[in-house]
Amino acid sequence: MRKAFVLLLALWVLPAEAAKQSAVPNRFGAIAYHRDSQSWGVAYDKPRARDAAVEALKQCGQQRCEVVHRFKNGCAALADGPKAAFAASGATRDEAETKVLKRCASERCRLVAWACTR
């Protein structure tokens, strides 16, 4: 009897928990950059990837800015090195920054921007 009660309880609770988790909406972000002018823009917590890209370009402010990185439900960072710019995503700001500096792989790399969704 007790096993049947626990089983019924589990069958009732687990789907409710799964529904709660799937009800959390995705949040999107983007980083735009124009290397020559060092202009950048970030967007985060947008309901759609396109919204994030449009906002990042708007924040960048230069006509020749480009979206260099898109991310979802996490963080992203942008670093500029002697020859190129790099971007990376991570679950946290620290993880994204660590990844991008490793990818840049130069002592002269500098962090330019970062952003995280909720």
Predicted regions and their residues:
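Helix-coil modules at protein/domain termini and other flexible surface or pore-lining loops
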Residues: 2, 17-118
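Hydrophobic h-region of N-terminal signal peptides that target proteins for export
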Residues: 6-18
